[in-house]
Amino acid sequence: MVNYPKKKKMHCPDERCNAHKSFKVVQYKAGKARLYARGKRRYDRKQSGYGGQTKPIFHKKAKTTKKIVLKLQCSNCKSIIQNVLKRTKHFELNDKKKTGNKDPTW
């Protein structure tokens, strides 16, 4: 289980800032696939009509986890940086660190 803060202070490399600023952290999510991309149009054309499945469907999945990609947005200039973390099964964005009876600090 990886807990990560929703806000993080780090250096903003953008020429507008070029200083340590507060960043808002969001987990990256892949966008919706485009219906009219060249490969999708070709695939749909091939699939139409009689004949069933025309291309192999991949079943031999090798990995059990995905790498965590974070989108960090600067509070000052709104520029976005993407940051890749290691593989993990459970990932959470939290305001507070989960500790025993101690005070939560980042």
From Swiss-Prot:
Source organism, top-level taxon: Eukaryota
Any one Gene Ontology molecular-function term assigned to this protein's record: structural constituent of ribosome
GO cellular component: a single term: cytoplasm
Subcellular location: Cytoplasm
Keywords: Cytoplasm, Ribonucleoprotein, Ribosomal protein
One annotated GO biological process: translation
InterPro entries listed in its UniProt record: Ribosomal_eL44 (IPR000552), Ribosomal_LSU_eL42 (IPR053708), Ribosomal_zn-bd (IPR011332)
Organism expressing this protein natively: Trypanosoma brucei brucei
Keyword Cytoplasm: yes
Family, similarity comment: Belongs to the eukaryotic ribosomal protein eL42 family.
Protein name: Large ribosomal subunit protein eL42
Keyword Plastid: no
Main location: cytoplasm
